[in-house]
Amino acid sequence: MKNNRILALSGNDIFSGGGLSADLATYTLNGLHGFVAVTCLTALTEKGFEVFPTDDTIFQHELDSLRDVEFAGIKIGLLPTVSVAEKALDFIKQRPGVPVVLDPVLVCKETHDVAVSELCQELIRFFPHVSVITPNLPEAELLAGQEIKTLEDMKAAAQKLHDLGAPAVIIKGGNRLSQDKAVDVFYDGQNFTVLENPVIQGQNAGAGCTFASSIASHLLKGDDLLSAVESSKAFVYRAIAQADQYGIRQYEANQNN
């Protein structure tokens, strides 16, 4: 592996369970050199958990600083505004052939500050330029414009997102379809794969970030997409099992591998 440089375009979780903390921890555990362009800051205020987007000019300066860095993989997380998303899209368009994993964060668990309706259409523009998208079930509903109540609904939504331009889709169903199983659906444009794990009760902040950054790490190292997804799901499952009140624990998950 000659080039182990991998980038995360993601926000800062003040409690370090998700966002860039999860991305960098996952990259480190995979032996990779992680870079970050920060899309937003977060804080717990009297209003609740708030997201503060990075100023457009500052975010562009971040990306300009990385213009000459040769990345072998990119993971995209929370893009809090359309303007930040536009700049991120321009950045990845300049890197054809680099594996890109898009975690299309549209609904934060803690807040509705993200402008969901505007970001939907902007994120769809990313689809032809990424390797795989990893929406959770509510995000898949918004992007596909349909309700998802059954496994067949998940498959139909994955097909629709593929038709919108995503080469591959994995919808993270969590325990919405089953109380005792976490069910995900992976679609590569030809075949569906259903992935299941027993549900672990407790804090899972950072699970989606870790999942996407783990997939990006495995793609960089040469794994095929399905293998990357399966390995990443297993890793996240172990990390959730080690979670504390601030989120999942990547390092402990790796030690218990």
Language model regions located:
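Conserved phosphate/ATP/ADP-binding segment of small-molecule kinases
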Residues: 115-191
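Phosphate-handling active-site elements
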Residues: 31-35, 192-193, 218-231
